[in-house]
Structure formats: C-alpha cells, structure tokens
Design a protein with these regions (language model features):
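Glycine/proline-rich, positively charged
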Residues: 1-81, 88-89, 103
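Structured C-terminal cap/extension of enzyme domains
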Residues: 55-179
Length: 179
C-alpha cells in the first residue's frame, strides 16, 4: 500500500502508529509487506523484556523501517512512583525514562509529552547530556516497572473488556481521556 501511494505521487512517506494489543502483529506485518517508512508505537522501560516485541523491532529495523517510541514515560500515579524512590546523581526519573529509550539504538526518535517549560528544559538537558544510564539506574527502572505493573495500562484491551462482556471499549475511553 505504501509503495503504491508513493509511486502515484500521493505521498512521499508512509507510516502508522499503533496503541492496542496488536502492536507486535502490526509491526511484523509491516516488515513483511514493505512500503512502510516509519512506525510509532508504545515503547518504554516496561517492555524491554518482551521477546516478541523485540523480535518485531528487529524485523522492522532489518526492513529499513524507522521506529518512533511513544508513551516513553509509562506513567502511573505520582504517589506510586515516589514509593519506589528512584535516585540518581545525574537524572530525574523522567530523564532516566527517556535515556532508557534512547539507549536502544534501534529507536530512531521518541515522543515525549511536555506540558510545561520545566519538562521541556529537563528533556532537552537529558538529550544534550552525553552521560548514559548506569546499571543501577536501569535496575531501578526495572524495579519501578515491577512494583507498579498493576497500576499501569498495558494496552491489552481484550483482558479488561472481557470482564465486562466487551460492552465498553475501555482502551478507547482511556485514550480519549488522555488526549
């Protein structure tokens, strides 16, 4: 599809974003079909151990598809994050979350919501810093992921929606509230 649109002159680049539980399926299909220039998908410190996602990322990179990480903060309520007590001499928790995404060389760009000047400054500072995360900081992010997993939406709508007979599209409602 993407190749046809490019050949017809209707577009120079073709890509898509995906949120739901079919991210791996869509990425694998894009790698096989071709004609896709970029995919924006949920990627953050909570998903690093996901073997299927990592294989899909590898397939996309091998196919020359640019990968854009979104939902990089993988936030949960602040009080839960404070309980974990992330500590670093070099980075705030938000900066560490971004640095962890940027540490993956397969990721070409990252989207990070910034609703105030302080966040813009923090993100720019993290981007400009040549310092990498330490193993201790990665370990703290893994601990944060484990301890707050039950309070973070993983986008697996089929689980939540099946509990209410699928009559309410929970994932769509959550995205509506977010955006």
């Amino acid at each position: 599809m993407g190749d046809d649109l490019k050949k017809s002159g209707k577009t120079k680049f073709f890509g898509f974003s995906c949120h739901d539980g079919n991210v791996v399926e869509l990425m694998n299909k894009a790698a096989k079909v071709g004609g896709i220039d970029a995919i924006m998908f949920r990627y953050n410190f909570r998903q690093y151990g996901d073997v299927q996602l990592n294989q899909a990322i590898d397939a996309c990179k091998a196919a020359g598809i640019g990968l854009i990480a979104m939902k990089t903060q993988a936030s949960v309520p602040d009080d839960l994050e404070k309980v974990v007590g992330f500590t670093s001499k070099n980075f705030t928790l938000g900066q560490a979350k971004l640095k962890s995404v940027w540490a993956d060389e397969r990721i070409d760009a990252a989207v990070s919501g910034m609703n105030n000047v302080q966040l813009v400054q923090e993100n720019c500072s993290a981007a400009a810093s040549p310092m990498q995360l330490s193993m201790n900081e990665f370990t703290q992010l893994n601990r944060l992921a484990a301890l707050t997993a039950s309070s973070h939406c993983k986008g697996c709508n089929h689980i939540c929606e099946s509990k209410i007979n699928g009559k309410i599209r929970i994932g769509d409602a959550m995205r509506y509230l977010m955006y």
